[in-house]
């Protein structure tokens, strides 16, 4: 990457799924512009990287910020996903048992969304945007109306206290259930 930058072929570069050690080693060779990792209310493990990102002035691109759609509150324990075509069929947060555990979080998002004239997805994204100015969520969508809805999350304002309140709720293990990846996909990660 350093050679490509020096040759003028690229101006910035980033890495995905990086932990602190990988990030520091890469940055020592060629300054990293951004790191892309999974991050959402359901998966906050990479928050431990935030001090390093601030120290090194690296942006954070958050993929799956809506936890594969769970935080949109559009699904429930009766939702079915085709095992042949929809990877959510194998994701633990979409089991009936997980929905029972996550119901409190979903209700909380719906209530806050009603109070803010927003959607649960917008609250989830606004929470992320309020965390740090260098976080850029990249929610995936196939539908135009979801694209517009997600974009409008930038207009939803959460106070510092509201963000802390959400964090306190998320810190209680009883309120969040689901894991990062299904076992069949873990083997592809080093």
Provide a role label for each language-model segment.
Residues 13, 35, 53, 60-63, ...:
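Conserved, mostly hydrophobic/aromatic
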Residues 15-16, 64, 118, 137-140:
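Active-site-adjacent beta-strand anchor residues
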